[in-house]
């Protein structure tokens, strides 16, 4: 009887999740602007329920799109009719999700210390929040946990503060997981937190950084969305706020900042994955950071971490105008990418958002740069498309390790070039 009950509970949990059986991810290659526009027509056909992992940008830039099983034939016919090339990147999305769940289940078990915590698996929101508490308890002189707000659904929004003392010192901000389905980012954030406590006092270069600068690390920037990726829809990107007059849920928190808000590269359609919201900072998850940054007033570097595509980006995204500090930002990016690549040979591109990928309005680092935070950067971590958002857990630690080398480069530059 008990065995049957447990099986029923497990089955109920599985059945509650959105199913992606037969969904494929296509990689579309566009040769000219006319083909880009044709793919944008596809993007507007809501009945197909397409999920663009990498949207149409410009000729030569790959487009990745998850296509639900019922829409596959129609999409392929459309592409072939217009001479647009494509390959199948992921044959069946659900197979990767099943592998991910099996790996997580096999790695379950509550860690009592940060040394026994498993950094090579994906964790739930509760497990990450537990990890934060353990880390603070182990290093009370170095780490504290701040609540900077509450999410739309009432979850606490936490930031870890790493500091060796002093009031309102110059600071570095790092956030991960603003797009909830980008699981390798939150997992990397957890690894960064542990790395900071390990390297302080051991690595002279990092010790110098933390002796002079505070570090604020927001590991789960979109807690509602992240919880939803675990409970119901692994592919959820946005927040979970409700928009009056629409059945569609959520806002893209990386289109909700007051920097070119509502311009090209964001959508006014609440059902779009890039819906910008009704007004700037409408999302409490964004407003909490805005208020924190403004109240602090001394943040010198701001780094927002996404996946995937293997990019290091700096402003601007909403306009073609180059930032005043373009040459310096470009040189830092070049050095950071070289450091990252030195570990495993992972290749990254770098440049401004609008010239490297596409125009995007209302983005995080455009706002921070406009607020006077000169060293504003955004990462897109592994990979370049084999797995996309479903990066195997075996790549978490290598991804975090190589990214840390790039972060160190940015942090050292920030320390050595005060402004």
From Swiss-Prot:
<feature type="binding site">
    <location>
        <position position="237"/>
    </location>
    <ligand>
        <name>substrate</name>
    </ligand>
</feature>
<keyword id="KW-0645">Protease</keyword>
<keyword id="KW-0732">Signal</keyword>
<dbReference type="InterPro" id="IPR000834">
    <property type="entry name" value="Peptidase_M14"/>
</dbReference>
<dbReference type="Pfam" id="PF00246">
    <property type="entry name" value="Peptidase_M14"/>
</dbReference>
<dbReference type="GO" id="GO:0006691">
    <property type="term" value="P:leukotriene metabolic process"/>
</dbReference>
<keyword id="KW-0865">Zymogen</keyword>
<feature type="binding site">
    <location>
        <position position="358"/>
    </location>
    <ligand>
        <name>substrate</name>
    </ligand>
</feature>
<dbReference type="GO" id="GO:0008270">
    <property type="term" value="F:zinc ion binding"/>
</dbReference>
<dbReference type="GO" id="GO:0005615">
    <property type="term" value="C:extracellular space"/>
</dbReference>
<comment type="similarity">
    <text>Belongs to the peptidase M14 family.</text>
</comment>
<dbReference type="GO" id="GO:0004181">
    <property type="term" value="F:metallocarboxypeptidase activity"/>
</dbReference>
<keyword id="KW-0479">Metal-binding</keyword>
<comment type="subunit">
    <text>Monomer. May form a complex with proelastase 2.</text>
</comment>
<feature type="signal peptide">
    <location>
        <begin position="1"/>
        <end position="16"/>
    </location>
</feature>
<keyword id="KW-0964">Secreted</keyword>
<keyword id="KW-0862">Zinc</keyword>
<feature type="disulfide bond">
    <location>
        <begin position="248"/>
        <end position="271"/>
    </location>
</feature>
<dbReference type="InterPro" id="IPR036990">
    <property type="entry name" value="M14A-like_propep"/>
</dbReference>
<feature type="binding site">
    <location>
        <begin position="254"/>
        <end position="255"/>
    </location>
    <ligand>
        <name>substrate</name>
    </ligand>
</feature>
<dbReference type="GO" id="GO:0006508">
    <property type="term" value="P:proteolysis"/>
</dbReference>
<keyword id="KW-0482">Metalloprotease</keyword>
<keyword id="KW-1015">Disulfide bond</keyword>
<feature type="binding site">
    <location>
        <position position="182"/>
    </location>
    <ligand>
        <name>Zn(2+)</name>
    </ligand>
</feature>
<feature type="domain" description="Peptidase M14">
    <location>
        <begin position="121"/>
        <end position="414"/>
    </location>
</feature>
<protein>
    <recommendedName>
        <fullName>Carboxypeptidase A1</fullName>
        <ecNumber>3.4.17.1</ecNumber>
    </recommendedName>
</protein>
<keyword id="KW-0121">Carboxypeptidase</keyword>
<keyword id="KW-0378">Hydrolase</keyword>
<feature type="binding site">
    <location>
        <begin position="179"/>
        <end position="182"/>
    </location>
    <ligand>
        <name>substrate</name>
    </ligand>
</feature>
<feature type="binding site">
    <location>
        <begin position="307"/>
        <end position="308"/>
    </location>
    <ligand>
        <name>substrate</name>
    </ligand>
</feature>
<feature type="active site" description="Proton donor/acceptor">
    <location>
        <position position="380"/>
    </location>
</feature>
<feature type="binding site">
    <location>
        <position position="306"/>
    </location>
    <ligand>
        <name>Zn(2+)</name>
    </ligand>
</feature>
<dbReference type="InterPro" id="IPR034248">
    <property type="entry name" value="CPA_M14_CPD"/>
</dbReference>
<dbReference type="Pfam" id="PF02244">
    <property type="entry name" value="Propep_M14"/>
</dbReference>
<dbReference type="InterPro" id="IPR003146">
    <property type="entry name" value="M14A_act_pep"/>
</dbReference>
<feature type="binding site">
    <location>
        <position position="179"/>
    </location>
    <ligand>
        <name>Zn(2+)</name>
    </ligand>
</feature>
<comment type="function">
    <text>Carboxypeptidase that catalyzes the release of a C-terminal amino acid, but has little or no action with -Asp, -Glu, -Arg, -Lys or -Pro. Catalyzes the conversion of leukotriene C4 to leukotriene F4 via the hydrolysis of an amide bond.</text>
</comment>
<feature type="propeptide" description="Activation peptide">
    <location>
        <begin position="17"/>
        <end position="110"/>
    </location>
</feature>
